[in-house]
């Protein structure tokens, strides 16, 4: 593998994907402390919203400690060099949420959809570009589509105005060959000036390896979280990826040791439980289950007295996707009845 002299844009997920691991209960003080540390380390992009994106505060997805407006208005004025991004899932977030984020100073909007449903993003991607924002099409659960079919969905997002397309391994299911094939096809099939990104989860302990493979295949943006704070077994641990990529001769412009310090001294003490590859998160990666289902499944398992891994395996067999959180309890009830 040769990634020497490649320029990589790192994007930290602690304050968005990390919300899942914190049951969306990150305080404003914690958010401020971590965001300023990441900014000081040179991380160029930091995502800040509810775990399920703008408008995610709900019974279905969980109520955060604060509103998106409070989080964004607290963090954005403190940034010296980092830009703040926000995730938006059509059907959860609306164009009004998008406008609110723009007015508060968000620089990047990432419009996310199930990898087969890019057509639902047209309104939001188009508006984001009209507002002059860095606009990302975020294709979730990308393992569920073959590379050429994924490219067709990516081309739709590109046609709506997205200047960057993400291959998103929401389940932490992909192996390195899966990543290489998809990123290569996207790089070859999209416009040369359309950037490619990769978002990994560490459910099979492949977050770093898959992200390096993505860079080798042509990805320029890489998502991760300091100390891996995120759904499932966490996102690609950003401080580890940064150290490895730097050793391999790539350029991130992120201070290796300051990012390590942010992970060790700020993120780890924030954790409600250790972010690691345990049995349940390994099942997520093995069965291809949406990573943010993990804590929902654990709660349903406790409530109905059934093994959480049985719930997750069934969800994988059903090929459930993000947005179907209500089915987790249905599966648990049916498993309890069948015992």
UniProtKB/Swiss-Prot annotation:
Keyword Lyase (UniProt): yes
Keyword terms of this UniProt record: Aromatic hydrocarbons catabolism, Lyase, Manganese, Metal-binding
GO biological process: one example: catabolic process
Annotated site residue numbers, Transition state stabilizer: 16
Catalytic reaction equation(s): (S)-4-hydroxy-2-oxopentanoate = acetaldehyde + pyruvate
Active-site residues from the entry: 20
UniProt cross-references to HAMAP family, sorted A to Z: HOA
Name of the protein in its database record: 4-hydroxy-2-oxovalerate aldolase
Organism: Shewanella woodyi (strain ATCC 51908 / MS32)
């Amino acid at each position: 593998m040769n990634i020497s002299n490649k320029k990589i844009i790192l994007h930290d997920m602690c304050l968005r994907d990390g919300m899942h691991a914190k049951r969306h209960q990150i305080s404003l003080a914690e958010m401020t402390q971590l965001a300023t540390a990441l900014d000081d380390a040179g991380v160029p992009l930091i995502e800040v919203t509810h775990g399920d994106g703008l408008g995610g505060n709900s019974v279905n997805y969980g109520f955060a400690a604060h509103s998106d407006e409070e989080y964004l208005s607290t963090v954005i004025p403190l940034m010296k060099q980092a830009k703040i991004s926000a995730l938006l899932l059509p059907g959860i977030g609306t164009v009004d949420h998008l406008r609110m984020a723009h007015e508060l100073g968000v620089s990047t909007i990432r419009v996310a959809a199930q990898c087969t449903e890019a057509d639902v993003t047209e309104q939001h991607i188009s508006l984001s570009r009209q507002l002059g924002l860095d606009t990302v099409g975020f294709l979730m659960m990308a393992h569920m589509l073959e590379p050429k079919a994924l490219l067709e969905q990516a081309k739709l997002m590109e046609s709506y105005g997205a200047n960057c397309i993400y291959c998103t391994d929401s389940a932490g299911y992909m192996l390195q060959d899966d990543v290489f094939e998809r990123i290569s096809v996207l790089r070859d099939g999209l416009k040369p000036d359309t950037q490619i990104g990769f978002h990994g989860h560490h459910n099979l302990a492949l977050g770093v390896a898959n992200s390096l493979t993505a860079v080798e295949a042509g990805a320029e943006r890489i998502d991760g979280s300091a100390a891996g704070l995120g759904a499932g077994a966490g996102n690609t641990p950003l401080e580890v990826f940064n150290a490895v990529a730097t050793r391999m001769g790539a350029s991130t412009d992120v201070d290796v040791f300051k990012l390590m310090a942010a992970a060790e001294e700020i993120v780890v003490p924030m954790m409600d439980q250790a972010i690691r590859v345990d049995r349940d998160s390994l099942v997520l990666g093995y069965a291809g289950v949406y990573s943010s289902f993990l804590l929902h499944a654990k709660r349903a398992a406790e409530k109905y007295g059934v093994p959480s891994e049985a719930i997750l395996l069934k969800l994988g067999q059903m090929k459930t996707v993000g947005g179907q959180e209500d089915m987790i309890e249905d599966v648990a009830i049916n498993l309890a009845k069948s015992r």
